[in-house]
């Protein structure tokens, strides 16, 4: 009997406390305004600065492009999404955290990593990059959980040397009229 009285008094006290202490004011003047909705959905944290996030995502068809674009555009704070299927690059601009963008793409079922090279090089700059098989680029040493890079030791821009207008590969080509002929 006493436990029933204690439970009923506790519920009455919680209802009274909820009514008087946790009541939020809503604008009553115009019922069509949405100011009260945005007030309750405001983020409590400080907003992030505008960032450009570049990802390297394995995409094979237009369906993959659509899946990646939809997964990223659902994030709060994304301004624009640029997807390049041929290069396998995704550029996201907005007030977002780069790790959240990476996790959103991975949740969509795509293998993704941060792109260490912001712009594609004009041509191959080393033999290591020239003889790379693109099918083995996403291999078993994929560092999925640690930091988002695919285990390469090169991060950042590669210095590109200039070779001039004529390429070395065309110097001994038979199709080139001005080529060097050695017999």
From Swiss-Prot:
Signal peptide: none annotated. GO terms for molecular function: metal ion binding. Residues 181-183 form a propeptide. A metal cation binds at residues 61, 64. The modification Cysteine methyl ester is found at residue 180. The keyword Metal-binding applies. Coiled coil: none annotated. A lipid is attached at residue 180 (S-farnesyl cysteine). It comes from the Eukaryota. Keywords: Lipoprotein, Metal-binding, Methylation, Prenylation. PROSITE patterns: HMA_2. Residues 50-113 form the HMA domain. Pfam families: HMA. Heavy-metal-binding protein. Belongs to the HIPP family. This is Heavy metal-associated isoprenylated plant protein 44. It comes from Arabidopsis thaliana. The lineage of its organism: Eukaryota, Viridiplantae, Streptophyta, Embryophyta, Tracheophyta.
């Amino acid at each position: 009997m006493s436990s029933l009285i204690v439970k009923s008094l506790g519920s009455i006290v919680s209802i009274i406390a909820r009514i008087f202490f946790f009541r939020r004011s809503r604008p009553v003047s115009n019922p069509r305004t949405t100011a009260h909705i945005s007030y309750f959905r405001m983020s409590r944290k400080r907003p992030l600065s505008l960032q450009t996030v570049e990802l390297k995502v394995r995409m094979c068809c237009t369906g993959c492009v659509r899946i990646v674009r939809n997964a990223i555009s659902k994030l709060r704070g994304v301004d624009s999404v640029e997807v390049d299927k041929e290069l396998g690059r995704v550029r996201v601009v907005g007030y977002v955290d780069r790790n959240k963008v990476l996790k959103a793409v991975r949740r969509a079922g795509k293998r993704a990593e941060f792109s260490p090279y912001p712009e594609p090089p004009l041509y191959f700059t080393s033999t290591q990059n020239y003889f790379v098989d693109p099918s083995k680029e996403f291999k078993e040493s994929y560092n999925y959980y640690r930091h988002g890079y695919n285990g390469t030791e090169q991060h950042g821009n590669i210095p590109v040397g200039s070779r001039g207008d004529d390429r070395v590969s065309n110097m001994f080509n038979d199709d080139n009229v001005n080529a060097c002929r050695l017999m």
